[in-house]
Amino acid sequence: AACASSLSALQIALHELRSGDSDTVLAGGVDALNDILMYMCFSKTPALSPTGDCRPFSMDADGTMLGEGVGILALRRLSDAERDGNRIHALIRGIGGGSDGKGTAIYTPLPSGQARAIERAYVQAGYGPETVDLVEAHGTGTKAGDKAELAGLHLVFDGKGDGEPWCAVGSVKSQIGHAKAAAGAASLIKAVHALSRKTLPPTIKIGEPADVLKDSQSFYLNSEARPWISAESRPRRASVSSFGFGGSNFHVALEEYTGPTAILPPRVLPSELFVFSATTTDGLVEELEGLIHTETAEDGFAAVAASTHGTFEADARVRAAIVADDQKDLAAKASRLIGQIETGTFGTAPLGAGIHASTTPPETGKVAFLFSGQGSQYVGMGADLAMA
């Protein structure tokens, strides 16, 4: 399925859940093949952009750019996720698949084949395209591909509305390029975030929309992030397309989750680790003060600690770590650290238990182990390790 392989994997994962063969499934795609050979192969097709930009559905679109990525989704049956208090980002209501069949060339898409996959997704979902507010398209930025994709979408969507465009269309490839085997997963993750954050995401690098969108009865190109206003009579709905190089087509129907808010998991450890990084001590003070003045409920304390790990930069010049039992303990230790910075004793006076800080640039570690991935050895491998 090539570029549609991650949504092909998703279809198999959904079958596993529906059949009861699995209770939790991880599905997605991985691509890290942007070596010179990959570019040489793609350069033999009209797919690559000579200007080095991917501009889906734009008048000046001239091709795609290759990207790399990993996209993995955790899937469960809704009843199981609600029972276990899992955080639910969105619902998958349907998925449709199919093939273009015979065409003029292996990389030439057929709108009719894509339309079949789209229609199958909505039949499975149990609702029509007129209730969909956002389509995260395959949108490679190639003239032929974008034109064919919009033609396929119009075959399904046109005549379902009141004649005025109601559905936003876009592509994450304008931001990250074409991640090939991971492309479908990237598009799906973007659409899921759009639903959970109630925001219509932008497609960037658009000067003037393509001609096929100017007179569209169904679609408009969203070029800036804005609140997602939806009808009160139904939840927000989005769809995702992913089309393969050889004609494999997949379309996923997503829906906003409107059920009860997931219960935060209980704290496992008596203390939590908070980590901070900045380029200057003033920057560190600003970060610490922000945390001191943030009211954190007991059930959210672990989540706040985890969020600091996501923004921590290990190679920053100024780094600090605090181990705290609760918000009061965290505020006291952060205040002690701020006090030392402001009095000029930072780095010389003892900080006390549970507080660690450094202004020394981190050193590059030595090689300790070597994992070849194949179990193979080479001459002098042990000597290389000994000298490292």
Regions found by a protein language model. Name each.
Residues A1-V268, E286:
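Condensing-enzyme catalytic core of the thiolase-fold
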Residues P109-Q124, L213, S233-V367, Y378-D384:
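Flexible catalytic loop/linker elements that gate and position reactive groups at enzyme active sites
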Residues A386-A388:
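Short amphipathic alpha-helix adjacent to the substrate-entry channel of hydrolases
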